[in-house]
Each structure stands twice: as C-alpha cells, then as structure tokens.
Amino acid sequence: MGILVILVDLQCCRCDAKIRKVLGCLEEEYCIEKVEYDVKNNRVIVRGKFDPEKLCKKIWCKAGKIIKEILIVDVWPPPLPQPPPPCKPPPCEKPPEDCKPKPCHCCSCEKPKPKPKPCHCEKPKPCHCEKPKPCEKPPPCKPEEPPKPPPEKPPPKPECKLVPYPYPVPYPYAGQWCCPKPEPPKPPPEPPKEPEPPKPCGCSHAFVCVCKPAPPPPPPCGCSGGHGNCGCGIRPWPPQVWPPPPVCPPPPWCYTEDNANACSIM
C-alpha cells in the first residue's frame, strides 16, 4: 500500500481546484483508494494500491507548478516519538550510609531552568505622532489616445512647362504679313478693236460709196467694261482675291489661373 503526502497551498482556490482535478483524473488509472485534504496544514494525503514513484512522477508532470513537495511515506500519520526511559541511579555497592546517588546527566533529569523575572521597566509612553494620512487615490487611468494620422501633404503646385513649338522662319512680327506679298492685279484686257472700214468698191465716189448700204454698227454690250454676263465674247475680269489672314505666333508662356499676387516668386 502506497502513501503520498503532497504539500500544496490549499488556501489558494486555483491550486486547490487544480490538485483535485489532477487526482480525479488519475484515480482509476493508479487505483487511488482514498484522498484526504488537510487544509490547515496544506497537505494532501493519497492512499491506494499503486507504485508511489510512478504516481509521484505523474503528479509532478501534471501539476508541477503548484506543488511544493511530495513525500513518500510508509505510515501516516507518523508515530509519535517514544519518551526516553526514566533515569535510574546505578546500584550502590558500598554501604547505604556512604552511598550517595550520583547526579544524572540525562536530558529528562536536568533541573528546569528558572523562569525569567518580570521586567520592572517603565511602560512605553504612547506615541504623540500624527496619524499617517490615508494614501491618495491614484488618478483614473486615461484611455490611450489612438495615434493621430500623419498630416496630409499639400498637393503640389502646378508647374509651368514650356512646350516646344515650331516657330516660322523668319519670325513673324505684328503688323506685317506672314506670307509673301500678293501679286498686283492684272490690268483689264483691252477693249476689242473696231472693225476696219470696208474697202472702196471701185466706183467714182471718192469718200462714201453709195452703191451698197453700210452695215449697221454693233449694238452696245452694256457691260460697263467688266464683261461679266455680257455676250460680247470678251472674258470677264478675274475676281479679286484677298490676302490670307496672318499667322499668329503661339504665346511664349503658358497661362495658369493661380493668383500671381499670392507668391513673391510668381
């Protein structure tokens, strides 16, 4: 029959619950018959038909953090120590008149020590010190503020970039034509020549022939010299052509809507 004495702090509720749970799990496996809990002395006595060394190792493995010590004993509670035998003086071989008992040097026969005398010192005077003030309550813990997000960076200012532009060569100046000068308009065509007078018919009339009547003169065309829709057969003048509009150069700098007075550099 094996007996184990386990030293545990049974005043602690967690340690008490832990050792009860461990011993309850090992009760059937190791044939534990009886478990006694001595709360005053913080001891647990385990009895049963088991191998004490194996059960001791198992309990150390399961609850080693709360156990102070495990004792393997044969008998519990341990037997009380027997009182020492009374000291008997050795028999005296001399006559009883000369025989005196020798002093005994055993522990039980020694004379008791005298009791200490009562102290006649003066009683300590009561202390007139001020009572200690109660401790101030600590201020309540403030909840930790969440970390503030980093400030947002301002958006970058728009940069003004110059875009290459193919300038005409030579560079056009204001008030001048960007294209070659137009050719002057051609003069109007000459009016048709009048037909030559008919040759004389060979008669005796010197200046005017009366033999044949003279052909009638051609009717006026009424085109006022332009010959636009006239049927006189003369081509009309070409229409007037205006010079092409000048080519304006691109602006030398780009334009932004930012306030120019906001920054001294701008």
UniProtKB/Swiss-Prot annotation:
Gene3D superfamilies per UniProt: 3.30.70.100
Induction info: By Magnaporthe oryzae.
Residue span, HMA domain: 1-68
Spans traversing the lipid bilayer: none
Composition skew (Basic and acidic residues), residue ranges: 142-156
Observed effect of gene inactivation: The pi21 allele confers an improved non-race-specific blast resistance toward Magnaporthe oryzae. Reduced salicylic acid (SA) responses (e.g. WRKY45 expression) but increased systemic acquired response (SAR, e.g. PR1b and PBZ1 accumulation), jasmonic acid (JA, e.g. JAmyb expression) and abscisic acid (ABA, e.g. SalT expression) responses in response to M.oryzae spores.
Keyword Metal-binding appears in the UniProt entry: yes
Annotated region described as Disordered, given as residue ranges: 129-156
Positions of a metal cation binding: C12, C15
InterPro entries: HMA_dom, PI21
General function of this protein: Involved in defense responses. Contributes to slowing defense responses toward Magnaporthe oryzae.
Name under which the protein is recorded: Protein PYRICULARIA ORYZAE RESISTANCE 21
Organism ancestry: Eukaryota, Viridiplantae, Streptophyta, Embryophyta, Tracheophyta
